[in-house]
């Protein structure tokens, strides 16, 4: 089960009121929604809903929240998902007892924010392309390198950074390191422009011989590849929920528009052509929902299946948003319905958590092997 209808109905009004009030006070669309984050934590304790008892599967309640919020403010859902999947989940799932004691509660309460750095601007067919290195020292580690894209970056207190480590036998190992962002040698780049998800800041970050304590290695073990693959899988599941929320938001706003009486007391939805077009969009949305709902049967043993769901749900979000714009775009000046924001957000989600093209390449690999 990936969606709780009862919970969604109970929370829908409160969620929309909080988001509406935030939009009224927001100075600009680039503003990081920190105040709204604190309100959601205080009102709903949202991050305590993250995991089930096995600490390995995103809970239905959390996915429901993410999807519900995305109907009105997808960028805020992405901020929450980043904190959850790039901060809380990795430490709770893989951290040592000391790491859990130091970070989990402050992360859940929103007292510290986290991000994850793994991309270096190259297609990651394997971890061999990673150039960021962690060198063992007498007292811990020295981290050097650059990550090209890190979400929530300049607002984070800690970053989880994937780095290459040369082991004693000369082989390369990979580990995830917990880095306090106030450490000397940590430098954030300028904000990276993107079409949508405004309010979710993305930056590069450079590490110049950053000195880390010995216990900064996540789980105190070089298990970076397994950890990263699991983290990305959880993120893609959350991004699928965001995509369905975007589809629902665009569809519902478009439907509300065509159900309003216009000139001569007529509604657009009274025309057969609009009825058929919205029926097609609704069918497409239902297909995406069904695909998403099937994920838990295969999620643990099949990461590619989760990637395929992410690919399809984002594609549907883009298509529904584009079609709604095409149907009501010429008339949209009559109503304040920012449908175009859904399209921009959907296109940005498509490249987050491994891009659509990288997923397509991975799917196609099974057919081109010798």
Give the location of each predicted region:
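N-terminal glycine-rich flavin-associated loop
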Residues: 78-98, 124-127
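Glycine-rich beta->alpha junctions and the first turn(s) of the following alpha-helix
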Residues: 2-6, 190-285, 349
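A structural signal for short hydrophobic beta-strand segments in well-ordered beta-sheet cores
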Residues: 132-135
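FAD-binding glycine-rich core of flavoenzymes that anchor FAD
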Residues: 93-119, 138-139
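Amphipathic, small/basic residue-rich leader segments at the start of a protein or domain
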Residues: 1-82, 102, 109, 367-370
